[in-house]
């Protein structure tokens, strides 16, 4: 039995169903959390709603529903099999102190089995509930609700905390039991003990309802919360595959257009199994993820740190597997166009940023292709001696040389090594990397945090000018511009910022003029002390990846610029003199560098 439902139908029906149940459809949030430094990407539908699940009132009310873009990077190396994905969409409905188990479970059952919605026979469903332990009682309430709705008692399974309990995220906090809903694929059971949660493939989880009803305290006790919440999640890709009777998410219409395009580029047909299918799935998943990251409202560019490193890694892994398939030359931009065409109606920001997405992919691909050819040749040259060794290990120093010289992420070298039956000395790589960092710091010890060489009047003036420059770049080039570094002395400023291409002569003139307009306006420079949360909510710009204290200083220059900063700054912009850009050049991949000076009255550059 299969249910012919497409991904777009599942998404629209889910939102429509819960709208009828008095839920407010809220928009999904950015794939890159703006105010949560603990994670690189939004990993679940509930992630953006954590403050509201913890008690903060949501402006849209107490019943919410949405579709959320998510990205998980823990299993990147597993991508290539039939099921693993990095990017996926999560459907979710929430009750913030409104309904609880009775209504939540009834809603799930009605959507899954109701004829206007999915129309699944209740006989194909099995559920799991919390079995209880010494700390919290067995969840008989959820089991009884399922049975009243029509799920046979033999299809209700009590599982331990490891399977049916959520939270807390730390040592203390909100938590509670959950109930998971599984679809019976119809394949024979693997054994007499086969049940939901078994890895044989007979049962596939399609929905999870989490009931936050307890708080775990520091003494280890669980106490009832004053306000109960419900958090649910259904992955679109997996659910569509299961309902369509497909053995793999990659066999659905979600991925077919991409796989067909990859097949056209490499001259191979997907579905013949073997290494080619694995590489096609890797390219398919990774270009989909990269397109959504690059198209996100919060800008991320390929780099060697944080979210940028994940982006660089999946792009470069795509390039390598494209070469394994026989694709010669650049190809990622054409695949991104397929992704954009599929999703632009739901996520219009992809079409809006299509040119930027294509440029970033082309730049990264072009840069890596040459290095990949040389690096693979170097790897093939040296690999025989490691294959002959008894340890069958690539030294960390060699892995670091591939990273430093050819831009091979450590994970790429490890992937090459696995294909050759080798392993990589990770500890040795870390040692070589740390030694390289130590050498890079020599000669830079005099620079204070924030890039200031001293706190003289001249250096302070350049510091304020840097804030004006940063905002001017964001106005002229776009809000994707982020500060990547600065070095400020009493003679000049040097400012590194994210931007995929050289600035045009006109853009440099516009930036220079905009900065000088603010200087001529003699704007006041004001400092406020506030919580980091208040600072971010007020629109202050902060350095991506920087670790801030809970209380920060925010410097505002009139209404033109507002940044989280430790200072010092001048009192008014009229003290700066004339701003002049001396040079604009590349600093690193996707990073530009400006050198500028301040001219006092009578000076000329």
UniProtKB/Swiss-Prot annotation:
Record's subcellular location: Cytoplasm
UniProt cross-references to HAMAP family, sorted A to Z: Ala_tRNA_synth_B (MF_00036_B)
GO BP terms, alphabetized: alanyl-tRNA aminoacylation
Molecular function, one GO term: alanine-tRNA ligase activity
PANTHER family given in the database record: ALANINE--TRNA LIGASE, CYTOPLASMIC, ALANYL-TRNA SYNTHETASE
Stored Pfam families: tRNA-synt_2c, tRNA_SAD
GO cellular component: cytoplasm
Superkingdom per UniProt: Bacteria
Main subcellular localisation: cytoplasm
Residues the record lists as binding Zn(2+): 463, 467, 565, 569
Gene3D superfamilies: 3.30.54.20, Bira Bifunctional Protein, Domain 2 (3.30.930.10), Threonyl-trna Synthetase, Chain A, domain 2 (3.30.980.10)
InterPro entries xrefs: aa-tRNA-synth_II/BPL/LPL (IPR045864), Ala-tRNA-lgiase_IIc (IPR002318), Ala-tRNA-ligase_IIc_anticod-bd (IPR018162), Ala-tRNA-synth_IIc_core (IPR018165), Ala-tRNA-synth_IIc_N (IPR018164), Ala-tRNA_ligase (IPR050058), Ala_tRNA_ligase_euk/bac (IPR023033), Thr/Ala-tRNA-synth_IIc_edit (IPR018163)
Cofactor(s) this protein requires: Zn(2+)
Cofactor note: Binds 1 zinc ion per subunit.
Protein name listed in UniProt: Alanine--tRNA ligase
Domain observations: Consists of two domains; the N-terminal catalytic domain (in this organism this is shorter than usual) and the editing domain; the C-terminal C-Ala domain found in most orthologs is missing. The editing domain removes incorrectly charged amino acids.
Role: Catalyzes the attachment of alanine to tRNA(Ala) in a two-step reaction: alanine is first activated by ATP to form Ala-AMP and then transferred to the acceptor end of tRNA(Ala). Also edits incorrectly charged Ser-tRNA(Ala) and Gly-tRNA(Ala) via its editing domain.
Family that this chain belongs to: Belongs to the class-II aminoacyl-tRNA synthetase family.
């Amino acid at each position: 039995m299969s249910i012919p439902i497409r991904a777009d139908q599942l998404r629209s029906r889910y939102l429509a169903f819960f709208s009828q149940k008095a839920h407010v459809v809220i928009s999904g949030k950015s794939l890159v959390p703006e105010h949560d430094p603990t994670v690189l990407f939004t990993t679940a539908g509930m992630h953006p709603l954590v403050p509201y699940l913890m008690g903060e009132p949501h402006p849209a009310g107490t019943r919410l529903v949405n579709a959320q873009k998510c990205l998980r990077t823990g299993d990147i190396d597993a991508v290539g099999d039939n099921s693993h994905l990095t990017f996926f969409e999560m459907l979710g409905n929430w009750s913030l102190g409104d309904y609880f188990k009775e209504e939540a479970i009834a809603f799930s059952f009605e959507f899954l089995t109701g004829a206007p919605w999915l129309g699944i026979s209740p006989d194909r469903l099995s559920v799991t509930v919390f079995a209880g332990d010494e700390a919290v009682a067995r969840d008989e309430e959820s089991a009884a609700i399922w049975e009243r709705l029509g799920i046979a008692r033999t299809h209700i399974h009590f599982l331990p905390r490891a399977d049916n309990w959520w939270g807390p995220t730390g040592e203390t906090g909100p938590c509670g039991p959950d109930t998971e809903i599984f679809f019976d694929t119809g394949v024979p059971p693997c054994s007499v003990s086969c049940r939901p949660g078994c890895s044989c493939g007979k049962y596939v989880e399609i929905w999870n309802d989490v009931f936050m009803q307890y708080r775990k305290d520091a003494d280890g006790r669980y106490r009832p919360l004053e306000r109960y919440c419900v958090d649910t999640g259904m992955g679109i890709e997996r659910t569509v595959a299961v309902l369509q009777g497909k053995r793999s998410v990659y066999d659905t219409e979600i991925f077919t257009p991409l796989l067909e395009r990859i097949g056209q580029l490499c001259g191979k047909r997907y579905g013949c199994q073997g290494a080619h299918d694995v590489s096609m799935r890797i390219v398919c998943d990774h270009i989909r993820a990269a397109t959504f990251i690059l198209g996100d409202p919060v800008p991320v560019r390929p780099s060697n740190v944080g979210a940028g490193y994940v982006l660089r890694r999946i792009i470069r892994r795509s390039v390598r597997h494209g070469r394994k398939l026989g694709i010669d030359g650049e190809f990622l931009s054409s695949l991104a166009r397929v992704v954009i065409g599929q999703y632009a109606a739901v996520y219009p920001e992809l079409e809006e940023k299509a040119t930027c997405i294509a440029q970033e992919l082309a730049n990264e691909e072009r840069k890596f292709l040459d290095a990949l050819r040389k690096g693979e040749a170097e790897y093939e040259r040296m690999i025989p001696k490691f294959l002959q060794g008894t340890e069958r290990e690539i030294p960390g120093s060699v892995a670091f040389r591939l990273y430093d010289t050819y831009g091979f992420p450590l994970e790429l070298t490890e992937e090459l090594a696995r294909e050759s039956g080798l392993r990589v000395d990770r500890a040795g790589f870390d040692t070589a990397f740390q030694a390289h960092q130590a050498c890079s710091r020599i000669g830079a010890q005099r620079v204070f945090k924030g890039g200031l060489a001293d706190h003289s009047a001249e250096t302070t003036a350049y510091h304020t000018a840097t804030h004006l420059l940063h905002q001017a770049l964001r106005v002229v080039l776009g809000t994707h511009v982020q500060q990547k570094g600065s070095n400020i002395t009493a003679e000049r400023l040097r400012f590194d910022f994210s931007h995929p291409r050289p600035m045009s002569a006109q853009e440099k003139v516009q930036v220079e003029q905009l900065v000088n307009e603010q200087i001529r306006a003699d704007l006041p420079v004001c400092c406020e002390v506030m919580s980091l949360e208040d600072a971010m909510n007020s629109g202050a710009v902060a350095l991506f990846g920087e670790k801030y204290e809970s209380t920060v200083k925010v410097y505002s220059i009139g209404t033109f610029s507002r940044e989280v900063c430790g200072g010092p700054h001048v009192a008014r912009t009229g003290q700066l003199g004339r701003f002049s850009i001396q040079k604009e050049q590349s600093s690193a991949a996707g990073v530009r560098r400006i050198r500028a000076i301040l001219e006092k009255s009578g000076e000329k550059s």
